[in-house]
Amino acid sequence: MASFCKHFREDIQTIKERDPAAKNYVEILLCYPGLHAIWFHRLAHALYQWGWFTTARLISHFSRWFTGVEIHPGAKIGRRLFIDHGMGVVIGETSEIGDDCLIYKGVVLGGTTLEKKKRHPTLGNRVIIGSNSTVLGAITLGDGVRIGSGSVVVKPVPPGATVVGVPGRIVESLTPEKEALDFEHGNLPDPLSDLMRMILQLHSKLEERVKRLENQNPKSNSDLGVKND
């Protein structure tokens, strides 16, 4: 019981420290569905470990209805997890989440097999997963990993890496000195934008080259029916 109370206090304090929108403790207690989902899960997980599987599932089912967050009672969750906004989050049975992680709305930690074995992701400590991202399979995301919004991750990610895109690609690796919980989506590298920028630059260079060739060979252009402006 003392351990439960300690975790409850930590959960509340975590939100106070990491969400600038949290005005006071009463608001946190009453208005944070992600917090409620974690509390329901702690109870359901304890019952699940004691073999009360159906009761645990009923609590999990009620929690999903009440909070919009679905956490299987078999999932193992570390300390100070913050589920921000929460709606649509799904955490599968064999998922494991380390300490001090941050999960935004719409995140799915899903499985890729019907076999009754480890089939869901394992998250290290201080992992951040952006909204509407999907992490599939029995893969491991190392400590300090950041997953950009809307990404689909199906391969293991080394500690400190940043992953974006579909499928997820590693675009940056942080050193331990630079590792932080800040997650400015606008500052994340975007490989698709970089690719488009490169294509546009190449197109511009080709246009300039064609114009130079046209100016050097006006007679050839007229023979081909090309008009020079």
Where do the protein language model's features map onto the residues?
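Proline-rich intrinsically disordered, low-complexity coils
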Residues: P20, P73, P121, P156-P159, ...
